[in-house]
Amino acid sequence: MSKRLTALIVLSLVIVLVGGAIYLRGPLQVAEDIGDGPREIEDLPKATAIVETDLYAEARDQMVEHGIIAYGIVSPEVIAVMRRVPRHQFVPEEYIHLAYENNPLPIGYGQTISQPFIVALMTQELDVEAGDKVLEIGTGSGYQAAVLAELDIEVFTIEIIESLANEAEQRLKEIAYENTHVRNADGYFGWPEEAPFDAIIVTAAPDHIPQPLLQQLKIGGVLVIPVGPIGGIQELWRVTRLSFDEFQSASLGGVRFVPFTRTRE
């Protein structure tokens, strides 16, 4: 898997809406029209489940070609899993007809399912391999966890909103992602009983990198996290643990994510 997506970090920046966030990236045309997009569900022909699945597969292919590969994602493994994960099963019913557009969508509780591009980018930057153990902070609807699970890794995911955690856990079980484990908790403290992790991914922006997450990384492990002020421009960081007390960080560009939610002290 590619260790870095260096083509994204350039001087000229374009503002793109991703994952309920603003992502500042390079000169690639990021507002590209994805053909006609998936048709409204009401307009789909009444046919068998197999035909319906094929229609979703075609929409996923269009999403991947025009919203992921065209924007610079190069990992064959990530591209393959983005073609497989049924995103329409992770959005509310009223948004199913928009499931394969390259946009974030509301999932309730003031949260969103991330834009497919940002999911692919962050997954690629984790640089995981089959058999790895990964911690996700911010389960949401479970889509990012499903993408990770398709890479044959063990996924531990934490969601602070109890209803979202319960719904995501049920959804992941129904789709048979048995290598996912959901916890309702404050993600700031990670999951110490299951540490260390080969990689950690955070899908909301704190104003600093939580120390517990750094300490729960294996030596050589990678943390991908947006950091910055609420409502302002943040940065997406890739942090590698080099030794017990040494870390190397690299910016992947400017972003704007929802704030990192904490339990009240």
Label each residue range with its predicted role.
Residues 1-5:
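Positively charged n-region of N-terminal signal peptides that target proteins for export
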Residues 9-14, 21-135, 146-147, 151, ...:
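Class I SAM-dependent transferase core
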Residues 127-248:
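Conserved nucleotide-cofactor-binding alpha/beta core module
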